């Protein structure tokens, strides 16, 4: 039986074009097709997982898996970029190079304020990088000792790095997959804690000096999704929004088994951590996806976020096709930085993700839609007709209309399109990229991402960010998110709001017939 509901815009549909700061243009001097304009991407060649996210002395540091000699995966280095606002990035020289012990896989960075490692030389606290060494020769020989943990330190705010003379700091002899250390300071016991991905679970280690580690526990062999190898853990303590209560959240990526195409994806667990191990607050089989799109992987949280904020960045690609996407000179981008909040909902504790308020500075032109719209003869409103970079905020109250779905459709003059919407019959948000342009480089790429709506609020909220080759959708204040990349042959410059039947829009304030107003804001450089 078809659901009947009314679409009522309670506020205004706002579509905003972005204005870019000169430093961002400088980061990407070329204007190659699909080059992101408000997401971080490397100047050239290969990038994957974000590593070592840390806020220190007024700068956000983004390190990342990087191969500087080709646009496909190769011997891993740590690339490096810094930002003062998480909007504009400056790429710095490579931070860590492979050496005789192996390639430099993923890891994390902490601020050693107490100089527990004894590596300080100078006035500022050292930054300590804990990372995985990967020995290719041992891997070829099927050795169980091909991955182990190393350390490096910096005494000049991350500009130069020196590796610890007696690496490795944590050896391995029993696991093929033994990687991606996530380290933080556990103040109740004045010690460091490491969360390490070990095949089908994570292990916990502790240390007083960041150099000698002891195993304390493990988690996950029978918990959550196991469609692929576990990677890139991020364990955080976070306040329950609006309360004084605190919970622990373990963010955990998996190499296969994602909700849309079975590819790489990221799940999370809510529970407790006692300094030795993690205890899941939900049933073993319960799976919470961080993102229902195909392209948000290896997501990790900044160490030392200002004002105790938990800010997350993910790699905006998927291992099913990352090496095949049709870009030139460079490959991959990062998601927008997102602030995490933990809320106690009617369905239990859930992570919410919100785009940072700092992105408002990129807004330029504004279009308002208000009043009754889309009556009997029309089911489409053209919102934007000449902008390739857009932010869309939509609020809809579901009551009595005949339309079973509504969507925002981005398109170009050659008929390619990307559709982002909500289906009331199935209660799913979705991104449909099957007609978005170049989709035949990998059979799994032509997909429709579906995200079940978990909120029972009568108001649908969708906050959408459209770059030239990516879309991020924050639904219901970030309770549900979807992230996808796409590759049109020409930029999408037209945005339509579409209902599949008689779609009614009505503002809270007036009963006037539909008006579309354009407002233009000159923003400061």
Report residues per predicted region.
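Beta-rich accessory regions
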Residues: 242-244, 272-525
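Beta-rich carbohydrate-recognition and catalytic domains
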Residues: 27-181, 185-228, 239-292, 314-370, ...
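Generic N-terminal leader/processing signal
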Residues: 1-2, 6, 16, 136, ...
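Bacterial Sec-dependent N-terminal signal peptides
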Residues: 1-29
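Alpha-helical transmembrane segments and their juxtamembrane interfaces
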Residues: 18-20, 138, 486
């Amino acid at each position: 039986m078809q659901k009947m509901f009314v679409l009522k815009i309670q506020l205004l549909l706002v579509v905003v074009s972005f204005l870019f700061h000169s430093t961002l243009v400088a980061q990407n001097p070329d204007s190659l097709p699909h080059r992101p304009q408000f997401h971080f991407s490397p100047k050239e060649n290969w990038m994957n997982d974000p590593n070592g996210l840390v806020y220190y002395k007024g700068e956000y540091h983004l390190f990342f898996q990087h191969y500087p000699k080709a646009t496909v995966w190769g011997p891993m280095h740590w690339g490096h970029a810094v930002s003062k606002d998480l909007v504009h990035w400056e790429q710095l020289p490579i931070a860590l190079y492979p050496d005789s012990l192996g390639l430099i896989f993923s890891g994390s960075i902490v601020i050693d304020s107490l100089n527990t490692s004894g590596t300080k030389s100078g006035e500022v606290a050292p930054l300590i990088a804990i990372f995985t060494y990967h020995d290719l020769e041992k891997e070829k020989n099927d050795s169980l000792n091909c991955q182990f943990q190393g350390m490096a330190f910096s005494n000049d705010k991350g500009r130069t790095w020196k590796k610890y003379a007696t690496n490795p700091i944590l050896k391995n002899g029993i696991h093929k997959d033994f990687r991606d250390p996530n380290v933080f300071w556990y103040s109740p016991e004045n010690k460091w804690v490491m969360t390490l991905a070990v095949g089908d679970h994570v292990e916990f280690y502790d240390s007083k000096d960041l150099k000698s580690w002891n195993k304390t526990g493990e988690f996950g062999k029978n918990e959550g999704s196991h469609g692929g190898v576990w990677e890139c853990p991020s364990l955080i303590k976070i306040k329950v929004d609006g309360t004084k209560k605190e919970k622990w959240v373990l963010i955990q990526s998996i190499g296969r088994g994602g909700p849309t195409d079975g590819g790489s994806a990221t799940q999370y667990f809510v529970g407790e951590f006692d300094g030795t191990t993690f205890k899941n607050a939900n049933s073993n089989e319960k799976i919470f996806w961080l993102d229902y799109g195909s392209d948000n992987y290896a997501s990790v949280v900044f160490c030392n976020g200002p004002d105790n904020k938990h800010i997350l960045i993910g790699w905006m690609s998927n291992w099913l096709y990352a090496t095949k996407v049709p870009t030139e000179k460079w490959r991959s981008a990062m998601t927008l930085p997102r602030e995490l909040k933990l809320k106690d909902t009617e369905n239990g504790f859930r992570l919410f993700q919100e785009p940072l308020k700092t992105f408002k500075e990129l807004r330029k032109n504004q279009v308002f839609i208000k009043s009754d719209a889309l009556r009997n003869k029309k089911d489409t409103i053209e919102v934007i007709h000449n902008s390739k970079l857009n932010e869309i905020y939509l609020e809809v109250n579901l009551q009595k209309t005949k339309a079973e779905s509504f969507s925002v459709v981005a398109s170009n003059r050659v008929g390619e399109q990307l559709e982002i919407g909500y289906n009331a019959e199935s209660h799913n948000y979705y991104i449909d990229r099957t007609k978005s342009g170049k989709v035949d480089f990998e059979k799994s790429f032509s997909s429709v991402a579906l995200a079940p709506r978990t909120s029972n609020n009568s108001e649908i909220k969708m906050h959408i960010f459209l770059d030239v080759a990516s879309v991020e959708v924050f639904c219901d204040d970030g309770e549900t998110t979807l992230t996808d990349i796409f590759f049109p042959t020409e930029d999408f410059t037209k945005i339509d709001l579409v209902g599949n039947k008689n779609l009614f829009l009505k503002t809270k304030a007036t009963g006037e017939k539909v008006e579309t107003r354009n407002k233009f804001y000159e923003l400061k450089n």
